[in-house]
Curated annotation (Swiss-Prot):
It comes from Deinococcus radiodurans (strain ATCC 13939 / DSM 20539 / JCM 16871 / CCUG 27074 / LMG 4051 / NBRC 15346 / NCIMB 9279 / VKM B-1422 / R1). Pathway: Cofactor biosynthesis; riboflavin biosynthesis; riboflavin from 2-hydroxy-3-oxobutyl phosphate and 5-amino-6-(D-ribitylamino)uracil: step 1/2. This is 6,7-dimethyl-8-ribityllumazine synthase. GO terms for biological process: riboflavin biosynthetic process. It is an enzyme of class 2 (transferase).
Amino acid sequence: MQRIEATLLAHDLKFALVSTRWNHLIVDRLVEGAELAFVQHGGKTENLDHFLVPGSYEVPLVARRLAETGRYDAVVCLGAVIKGDTDHYDFVAGGAANGILNTSLHTGVPVAFGVLTTDTVEQALNRAGIKAGNKGGEAVLAMIETANLLKQIER
């Protein structure tokens, strides 16, 4: 059996980041973690384009348009949806997750779900680099590996 694994090198990769303005104090940390991970793994900042959208519900449409351009090896979606007292959380979080997944499957371009879905602001901050690592950086690493694996499959 042949085992195929991808590298975590971003030297030849071009990524799009889509992040939300909503909950920007949290999301800005995710973006910083994403950029740091990309550069630490050999990516060049000029190969990382950053697009800002109002909120998580707008992320899938912009991600899909970016994926359809063919200019990007992967799209990384970053945001934070924090539960409140209404059902709004369920609709926004579920819509964003489904839209991002459908974008990846429809376009064949890897699209990362780096949208935090938490009960509290504290939980979101922890996942944005305070205590529990940085989910923005983790999303970029997953996309580096996936994009490189797809390149191997396409050879």
